[in-house]
Amino acid sequence: MLAAVAVLGGLALLLTAKSEGTAAHAADGGRAEIEAFNKKYIEAHLKMNNAAIMATWAEDGVGLLPGTAPMIGKATIGKFLNDVTSRMEGYHMQKVEMDFQGISVSGDWASEWAYEHQVVQPPDQKPVIDSYGKLLLVLHKEADGNWRVTREMWNQGMKP
């Protein structure tokens, strides 16, 4: 009887260890997927490629910027982005840095925040725009397997 209990106890430990290992592997895989998403997200912003930026957004995404009403839906966010960049003829993004922190993945949902730094060169030799901010993203892995932004909140930061 004790041998049977010991065997059952051993099996329970093995099953627990296996499920914890599987969960850890899934979390590691999720983190790697988020890190890959982040590289695409940064690259799209560096190139000022509105189509690539919008490809990172969910249809029902919400953008939260200071001093503005929430931008609800991909179409609204895309219009805002196009309006802003249409007023930036001749501007060149020289640098985009996003230092992502606190990456947390739970199934098909993830969140992270970042320190953000952009350097933009205006036309006509005007002084560069050197800005800092903080960013919070909530991401969802959609049916097509791609992670997309469902919520983004940004605010002005200070130079570290």
Where are these regions (language model features)?
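N-terminal Sec-pathway targeting helices
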Residues: 1-3
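Short, low-complexity N-terminal intrinsically disordered segments enriched in polar/charged residues
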Residues: 6-56, 160
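A short acidic/glycine-rich loop-to-helix N-cap element
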Residues: 25, 123-129, 159
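A solvent-exposed, acidic/Ser-Thr-rich amphipathic alpha-helical stretch
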Residues: 28-35, 50-105, 115, 127-131
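Short beta-strand edge/turn micro-motifs at domain boundaries
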Residues: 132-160
